[in-house]
Regions:
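Juxtamembrane transmembrane-helix termini in multi-pass membrane transport proteins
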Residues: 5-75, 132-153, 160
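Selected transmembrane alpha-helices and immediately adjacent juxtamembrane segments
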Residues: 101, 105-130, 136
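Juxtamembrane boundary at the C-terminal end of a transmembrane helix
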Residues: 191-200
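Short hydrophobic transmembrane-like helices used for membrane targeting/insertion
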Residues: 1-3
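Hydrophobic transmembrane-helix microenvironments that flank and shape a buried ionizable site
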Residues: 23-29, 56-57, 77, 81, ...
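Alpha-helical transmembrane segments of multi-pass membrane proteins
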Residues: 21-25, 55-56, 86-94, 119-123, ...
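Membrane helix-loop-helix hairpins that form the core translocation module of multi-pass transporters
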Residues: 43-112, 160-171, 176-183, 190
């Protein structure tokens, strides 16, 4: 029975943590703003959602692979400390409001799915949620579950935005969301550091 419980925990912890971190971190993020712009321009939610899904899977798989192998190559206390500190830095970054770049407000011509796929993939590079994915993969030493969780988190945040537009960002004040995201990043960072020094 204990083995079954431990097995479920191994699966659920990286999956649920990754989903929660990215779902909250994505609200008000640049990629969510992009999803709103695409929805307003094309008014075709299905190909936009599919484009977001595919772009996120590609982008976050790459990010998870990077985190996974970085954890393999850079083992030991210094690396774990670096991961913990990185999460604390992410907590500070999460408090900074995102804005849509002016050059992304004008989306180029092309098929809706392909346009969404390309623009979303490019905008996600170096974004908070991509970096969070890399750190989560390093923390849990998982590729599949972390990628599945972060992709699900992106969809949880972006699908309502595609259907509801900017109204979705007003359901809960963005300041509250940013504080919640910062709190989650800070807790994970503290957890990693405490675990590294065997304080928990």
């Amino acid at each position: 029975m204990r083995i079954l419980y431990e097995g479920r925990r191994v699966i659920l912890e990286p999956l649920l943590t990754s989903t929660a971190v990215v779902a909250i971190g994505e609200i008000g993020d640049k990629t969510q703003l992009l999803a709103i712009v695409l929805a307003a321009k094309f008014k075709r939610p299905v190909p936009i959602i599919l484009g977001v899904l595919c772009a996120t899977l590609l982008n976050h798989t790459m990010a998870s692979v990077l985190g996974f192998y970085a954890a393999d190559w850079l083992t030991g206390t210094p690396f774990r400390v670096a991961v913990g500190v990185a999460f604390l830095v992410m907590a500070g970054w999460a408090l900074i409001p995102d804005k849509m770049d002016d050059d992304l407000k004008t989306i180029g011509r092309g098929g809706i799915f392909l346009t969404t796929l390309l623009t979303f993939f490019v905008v996600e590079i170096g974004d908070k949620t991509q970096i969070a994915t890399t750190l989560l993969a390093a923390r849990f030493h998982q590729i599949t579950l972390v990628t599945a969780g972060t992709t699900l988190g992106m969809l949880i945040a972006d699908v309502p935005a595609i259907f509801m537009g900017e109204a979705v960002t007003k359901v809960v004040p963005l300041r509250v969301v940013r504080i919640a995201a910062a709190g989650i990043f800070a807790m994970i960072g503290a957890w990693v550091l405490l675990d590294t020094f065997r304080l928990v």
